[in-house]
Amino acid sequence: MAARNCTKALRPLARQLATPAVQRRTFVAAASAVRASVAVKAVAAPARQQVRGVKTMDFAGHKEEVHERADWPAEKLLDYFKNDTLALIGYGSQGHGQGLNLRDNGLNVIVGVRKNGKSWEDAIQDGWVPGKNLFDVDEAISRGTIVMNLLSDAAQSETWPHIKPQITKGKTLYFSHGFSPVFKDLTKVEVPTDVDVILVAPKGSGRTVRSLFREGRGINSSFAVYQDVTGKAKEKAVALGVAVGSGYLYETTFEKEVYSDLYGERGCLMGGIHGMFLAQYEVLRERGHSPSEAFNETVEEATQSLYPLIGAHGMDWMFDACSTTARRGAIDWTPKFKDALKPVFNNLYDSVKNGDETKRSLEYNSQPDYRERYEAELDEIRNLEIWRAGKAVRSLRPENQK
């Protein structure tokens, strides 16, 4: 990028923007402060009727409702779920993040995984206690009033014939991805007709769900109702969204959640970005640039300097903060990239909506040698020159200097 001096000047600001405030009153502390008193009140008096606030915001001329964490302070959350046991099934990325956040918020949450498997051992390492709040899957479901199915998509499909009969009337079925119910023709996940079925989908990995919660910030999430038997499914979804660590939530449908999620992962979030990284890096190398220069101009400057600023201020601000040369070139080339890429993105959306991506995922991830094949793919990516160069570049960052 031509605006080298501008970029260097902006880097301290990017680091500042990426660092959470040191002095922050966290939701975790609030939950701890009221936990004991709420338990006493729950016995002494019936639950009070609470008014749940909703904020209407303008998103580029479109009015949308947003549900904020402030509408559900710790005392209200604990009171709302005082008669519930949240049975979290699966302890992968989302299970880990959401489960620990629920536990820290003081809710009665238990984990259900295969006994003595890797997830069982991982849960024990995180402080879950066998026989107290760690059980095998069947035992956890039998104890739970809200069953949070956070198994992988493939595992949800494989285990559903066994799990479905245990989702009995009066329970609530919770997902964090619309994959299984939406593509039921492929997954065979037909939900029972006599239970509430809801979704909370954090917009980030389970690690991010956990780290933002611990920083007192909270991740943004979508929520949806697939089936409302009790008339309280929407409120329950919002409350659970806050409980698992959301800072705010916006409403969607199961269909829109899964379409946008699969589309985004394959596009700008990972697949498309990786493809652009590779293409730009390879051209630079073919034109005689060194690995360090090619990586810095392709990945390092983007992730360490520009992307944090775009996230904080928007693309218009980024253009305005750059040199006239960088600005002119970026603006001129934007429509060329858009025109070249839009047909690819339309094909991708079609592939998501018609179920091709779901079929591919289920078939691949259900193979007995899935793990070995995946590790081989990952090893190939790890050994690409771009990422081997990146490892060396990252070692030079000040925070990595010993």
UniProtKB/Swiss-Prot annotation:
The keyword tRNA processing does not apply. GO terms for molecular function: double-stranded DNA binding; ketol-acid reductoisomerase activity; metal ion binding. GO terms for cellular component: mitochondrial nucleoid; mitochondrion. It holds the Pfam family KARI_N. Pathway: Amino-acid biosynthesis; L-isoleucine biosynthesis; L-isoleucine from 2-oxobutanoate: step 2/4; Amino-acid biosynthesis; L-valine biosynthesis; L-valine from pyruvate: step 2/4. Its main location: mitochondrion. Its cofactor is Mg(2+). Binds 2 magnesium ions per subunit. Residues 63-252 form the KARI N-terminal Rossmann domain. NADP(+) binds at residues 90-99, 114-119, 152-156. Substrate binds at residue 323. Belongs to the ketol-acid reductoisomerase family. This is Ketol-acid reductoisomerase, mitochondrial. It comes from Neurospora crassa (strain ATCC 24698 / 74-OR23-1A / CBS 708.71 / DSM 1257 / FGSC 987). The gene is ilv-2.
